[in-house]
Amino acid sequence: NPPQALLNGLSIQPVKVLKNRQAYFAVYESAMQVESLNTDSQLLKTLAPHDVVATAPSDEYDFVSRYFWPASGGDEDYVTGSIHTGLAPYWAKLLEKTQLTAYQASSRGGHIQCDVGESTVTLTGHAVRYLKGTIYL
């Protein structure tokens, strides 16, 4: 059963809730539900260490999503590659295809191409560099 804080923290009730190590996945019937979803950050923060992703099938894309992470220091992430490594296998199985197009419906929004392999997920898309540096190991 999903935690009450999750259900109360989402303005629209999901049809299904799944969970992995990173987040609760609130699955909706339509992209419109995901796009119009409001959240209560204070309630979602109590779900730490888990964040929350809302997702649904879409007419324009294979699936859409939004990613909320108040427990980690922000309300909603613009485009989140890591969460798509969990979403893509779910939608690939459901839609019976391995190459998917996704849209993260944040205020800035972003398109992600997902290629689901046997044990890997490859993501491609456009990014904006915000930092440049060198790491020495």
Q: What is each PLM-predicted segment?
A:
Residues N1-L137:
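Active-site proximal loop and beta-alpha junction motif in alpha/beta enzyme cores
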